[in-house]
Amino acid sequence: MKKLILSSVALVALAGSSIAADLPSQKAPPAVAPAPLWKGFYVGLNAGGTFGNNSAVNGTTWNTNGPSNAAVMASALLSGSGSGSSGNAGFIGGGQIGYNWQARYGGYNFVTGAEADIQGIAGSGSDASRWSATNTDYLGQPVSLLSNQKGNANLSYIGTVRGRLGILIMPTLLIYGTGGLAYGGVNANVQNTQFWITTGGANAGSNSVITGNSPYSSTQVGWAAGGGLEWMFMQNWSAKAEYLYYDLGNAAGTAVNSYIGTGGFSGNNGLQSVTNYTGRVSGNIVRAGVNYHFNFANVAPVIAKF
């Protein structure tokens, strides 16, 4: 009896093993491919420097009134022009927001996107120019005019709205080009000092000093273009180095210079001149930044367990 029971148990175990071997195997579900690393919204901060010739000023000065408010006729205008330029450098810092798309084409991974940024600028520029003009017939008296002009133009802020197109040279390293609209707050001022010298006639040797200045402020719109490198150094975080060139067009204004009463004439006798000026607002930006990528597509799914 005992032998019969043991034989039955062995037979059942053997049959169970055979049935289990015939059952289809259950494979683990295939791994889900990770969503594109760069796709999605991002925000960040940046800081760096700006430099260039965005303080170049060109001016033309002419006299509208002579002593005693006598109008200077067109045939007797004392006029002169000059120009100057200088470098302009300052610190720049601000933030950006953007969106990336990632696609594979021809065996390469491309990243396209759009970005908007705005930065404050701490810096200024100035230049000076000197010119002279002579006229042999001002109310019958030969006179000469020597002008010293100093101008400056600077940006208080600059922002851009740009497209970006890049290629991944490594899964975590992007090289890109960028370009689009730029805008900025331009502040300019011209200060002009003139020396009016009567070289002949009854008032020969009489000298006068004229001085004045004119401020200018506006929001200029232009373009910007450049490129950079961006490195995804950890999940959702990237660092970038970027260069941009910007051109916001011309800033223009008029300075009215009034007699201040020195030299051969006394009191405010109406001696006056006008300076028109223009200055090109352009320059370079070199900056570094850090971005946080929201990358919602890469959020791990929640799997219920029972």
Residues covered by each model-derived region:
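Gram-negative outer-membrane beta-barrel domains
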Residues: 2-306
